[in-house]
């Protein structure tokens, strides 16, 4: 008898991401359904990330992904035909086997991830289940707090701000719908506040939809955010808190061993003092990548000093890699994981990293990349994991709002059951 869940087709293609760069999209077909997934790419990438395969040469300035697409169509597809689409772990294991390298450099992490996610979506579709329910079961019901990147600096913007992201977190809202309304209202007030202070040319948006005003000192965006939150009618800290992504690896001078912030040099201890000052002055509840990706000692220090009141997030530190995460847990470095599926390469590995973090009492933030697509898989993943947090940009640009809109739909589907993480975003024990 024919298995309706048998994979009968796998097709990859080259499409464009939100920055106009090529990326990989894959369709997976069964007898009764199909799944489509497109992969993102990052601008500030960790050294230990899985390798995104690019073509080189003149085409698309070397950023083409025809090799990755060909690897799906010629190497992966023939192996997947006939397999049961519900065998996610077996399929992910096969993808790793076909590549054969630790950093997925043969077939390409972009090829592998697109297939892995498309398989999960095809399975959910074939079973007539929403993706979050297929991945998380009946216990997937926590809607995440958005960490919305409304002011951009670093490599995401063309200004002199050294810290990469200044985010708002609507922790005091009662539902996701209310939370995203608060974010949207604050974002529009912020635009007005920035225009008044810096002029109409200061509200250009960065890769993630946030504004990139001509600021230099790290306190400037924090002051402007407090003003915008208050003018929007909310209480800073109690209703809307602040979060930072420092992306410190970009600020580290290998020769001097020091960090450069606002034109000044800081050693590890001095930078820690800066963070202590900022967290005592502003309602900052989360700091991502406060130190260089190999500065384990710096992460241990800040976690000891501030971890009781501030979430210390490892992004470039962990790169969603279970080995690096386990090392961090042993050392007491950071207390939260930034989960980016394309840093590790398969859905199974990403979910394993999340479970490792949860078991250690670490928080998990499901995250986008700066180069995104209209694919909203991470919205479903955040709910499937009951992660309690999602980082997917400002409430602007369709590639960012696709995720927020999907979360609005999921909350509607889960009416009467859905719980918004709110102030318990770090430890979601409902």
From Swiss-Prot:
Enzymatic reactions: (2R)-2-phosphoglycerate = phosphoenolpyruvate + H2O
InterPro entries to which the protein is assigned, alphabetical: Enolase, Enolase-like_C_sf, Enolase-like_N, Enolase_C, Enolase_CS, Enolase_N
Keyword vocabulary terms for this entry: Cytoplasm, Glycolysis, Lyase, Magnesium, Metal-binding, Secreted
Binding of Mg(2+), residues: 245, 288, 315
A GO CC term attached to the entry: extracellular region
One of the protein's GO biological processes: glycolytic process
Location in the cell: Cytoplasm; Secreted; Cell surface
Catalytic residue list: 208, 340
Family: Belongs to the enolase family.
Summary of the function given for this chain in its UniProt record: Catalyzes the reversible conversion of 2-phosphoglycerate (2-PG) into phosphoenolpyruvate (PEP). It is essential for the degradation of carbohydrates via glycolysis.
NCBIfam families for the chain: eno
Record-given protein name: Enolase
Biological source species: Pyrococcus furiosus (strain ATCC 43587 / DSM 3638 / JCM 8422 / Vc1)
